[in-house]
């Protein structure tokens, strides 16, 4: 499909035609999409309709319609590793994508737009700015992505999951599921708990080969301590994980997916996991100590930056992914498995970092900005007046602004916009 046109994936499902929606820009990975869905749930519970802008064929086109949310898409994709010809042609494609996004905004008439990151967020955010629609940014990671870096320059409010991402930020946290935030305090769960230590290993939806290999090896080297292991490994790496535990003669419950994560966190005494923003938000909300192994190939090493925040609060231990991981994990587990007081202290420290009301706070701020001054979309005009106004507006302002806007979004080898991550790869 040509990038000049936006594709409606699902028809509007607004509660009331007279109520203008909030538009969410998010896609590419679950780390962008799921926080957006959490905020959408809060907004819709308040009677505010939600619309979504994503990228053709990306994950959001499958997930968002499952929640009965209308989604439009742009033909925008990643250029990392695509060669110099693709990079040289990027400014034209970005300008076309911004125009296509402007078409969607004029059609949907959102009262406010919020970017959670992803391929379509850059064009969508720039179009919102050019059309005078209140724009907000929510950055999940401590090391912000290129798209949100650009949009933060002219967003009305810049919200973050962790402190230390932007000057002038508002660290509201990353949304987590209500049932996780509602778990009892660590002292209530952990004090006096008997039996083997309960170790929860989380590899994410794609699995983590480094954890599949290191955890069984570390436990075997410890001489098979009294520990119950529950290892979530992803469907594609299930056989590999089961074989690793069998070879190490370590008993473990290996699961491709855990449906009830709240119950899993409540069960756990200690977690070994990656350091994605959503996972760490859940670990903190649940109140459980963790051993963090950041994904070594993460863009801008953002998982290490995330992990360092928990380490600075003594809520986690950070281990680098390299050839010595199994040995260093053995050393860390040898200490933590034998020290329930330290595990409790880590869990309590994690809980102090939690922001369980993040989705509510983000929704509050969106609606504050939606009602803070006049937006360029609407202001009581009829549809015909609005169309005439926006066409004139675009002709006079948009074309001149697009060159500068696309230049700031032009992807270079170190950029994150727009970047297509490899699909289905084990991390």
Swiss-Prot record:
Gene3D superfamilies associated with the record: Glycogen Phosphorylase B (3.40.50.2000)
Pathway given in the UniProt record: Cell wall biogenesis; peptidoglycan biosynthesis
Catalytic activity: di-trans,octa-cis-undecaprenyl diphospho-N-acetyl-alpha-D-muramoyl-L-alanyl-D-glutamyl-meso-2,6-diaminopimeloyl-D-alanyl-D-alanine + UDP-N-acetyl-alpha-D-glucosamine = di-trans,octa-cis-undecaprenyl diphospho-[N-acetyl-alpha-D-glucosaminyl-(1->4)]-N-acetyl-alpha-D-muramoyl-L-alanyl-D-glutamyl-meso-2,6-diaminopimeloyl-D-alanyl-D-alanine + UDP + H(+)
Record-level Gene Ontology MF annotations: UDP-N-acetyl-D-glucosamine:N-acetylmuramoyl-L-alanyl-D-glutamyl-meso-2,6-diaminopimelyl-D-alanyl-D-alanine-diphosphoundecaprenol 4-beta-N-acetylglucosaminlytransferase activity; undecaprenyldiphospho-muramoylpentapeptide beta-N-acetylglucosaminyltransferase activity
EC category: transferase
Ranges where the record places region Disordered: 408-427
Subcellular location: Cell inner membrane
Pfam families in the cross-refs: Glyco_tran_28_C, Glyco_transf_28
Positions contributing to UDP-N-acetyl-alpha-D-glucosamine binding: 29-31, 141, 177, 205, 258, 303
Membrane topology: Peripheral membrane protein
EC number: 2.4.1.227
Keyword Cytoplasm in annotation: no
GO biological process: carbohydrate metabolic process; cell division; cell wall organization; lipid glycosylation; peptidoglycan biosynthetic process; regulation of cell shape
Statement: the UniProt record of this protein carries the keyword DNA damage: no
Entry keyword set: Cell cycle, Cell division, Cell inner membrane, Cell membrane, Cell shape, Cell wall biogenesis/degradation, Glycosyltransferase, Membrane, Peptidoglycan synthesis, Transferase
Disulfide-linked positions: none
Domain of life: Bacteria
GO CC terms in record: plasma membrane
Family affiliation: Belongs to the glycosyltransferase 28 family. MurG subfamily.
Role according to the record: Cell wall formation. Catalyzes the transfer of a GlcNAc subunit on undecaprenyl-pyrophosphoryl-MurNAc-pentapeptide (lipid intermediate I) to form undecaprenyl-pyrophosphoryl-MurNAc-(pentapeptide)GlcNAc (lipid intermediate II).
Protein name (record): UDP-N-acetylglucosamine--N-acetylmuramyl-(pentapeptide) pyrophosphoryl-undecaprenol N-acetylglucosamine transferase
Protein species of origin: Xanthomonas campestris pv. campestris (strain ATCC 33913 / DSM 3586 / NCPPB 528 / LMG 568 / P 25)
Encoding gene per record: murG
């Amino acid at each position: 499909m040509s990038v000049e046109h936006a594709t409606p994936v699902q028809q509007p499902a607004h509660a009331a035609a007279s109520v203008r929606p909030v538009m969410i820009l998010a896609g590419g990975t679950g780390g962008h999409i799921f926080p957006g869905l959490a905020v959408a749930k809060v907004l819709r519970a308040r009677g505010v309709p939600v619309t979504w802008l994503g990228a053709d064929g990306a994950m959001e086109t499958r997930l968002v319609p499952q929640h009965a949310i209308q989604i439009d898409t742009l033909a925008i994709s990643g250029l990392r590793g695509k060669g110099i010809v693709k990079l040289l042609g990027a400014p034209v494609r970005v300008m076309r994508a911004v125009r296509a996004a402007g078409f969607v905004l004029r059609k949907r008439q959102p009262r406010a737009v919020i970017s959670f990151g992803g391929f379509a967020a850059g064009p969508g955010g720039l179009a919102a700015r050019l059309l005078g629609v209140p724009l907000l940014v929510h950055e999940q990671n401590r090391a912000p992505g290129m798209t949100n870096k650009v949009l933060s320059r002219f967003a009305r409010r810049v919200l973050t999951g962790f402190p230390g991402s932007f000057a002038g930020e508002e660290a509201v946290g990353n949304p987590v599921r209500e049932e996780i935030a509602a778990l009892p305090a660590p002292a209530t769960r952990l004090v006096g708990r008997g039996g083997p230590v309960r170790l929860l290993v989380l590899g994410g939806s794609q699995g983590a080969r480094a954890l599949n290999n290191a955890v069984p090896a570390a436990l075997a080297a410890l001489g098979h301590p009294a520990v119950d292991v529950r290892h979530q490994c992803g469907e594609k790496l299930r056989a590999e994980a089961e074989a690793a535990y069998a070879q190490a003669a370590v008993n473990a419950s290996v699961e491709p997916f855990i449906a009830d994560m709240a119950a899993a966190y409540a069960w756990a005494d200690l977690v070994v996991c990656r350091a994605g923003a959503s996972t760490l938000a859940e670990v903190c909300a649940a109140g459980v100590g963790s051993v963090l192994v950041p994904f070594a190939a993460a863009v801008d090493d953002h998982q290490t930056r995330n992990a360092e925040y928990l380490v600075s609060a003594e809520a986690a231990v950070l281990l680098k992914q390299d050839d010595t991981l199994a040995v260093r994990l053995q050393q860390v587990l040898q200490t933590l498995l034998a020290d329930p007081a330290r595990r409790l202290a880590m869990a309590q420290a994690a809980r102090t970092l939690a922001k369980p009301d993040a989705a509510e706070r983000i929704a509050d701020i969106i609606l504050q900005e939606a009602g803070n001054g006049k937006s360029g979309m609407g202001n009581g005009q009829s549809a015909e007046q609005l169309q005439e106004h926006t066409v004139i507006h675009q002709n006079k302002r948009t074309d001149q602004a697009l060159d500068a806007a696309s230049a700031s979004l032009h992807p270079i080898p170190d950029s994150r916009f727009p970047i297509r991550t490899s699909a289905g790869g084990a991390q």
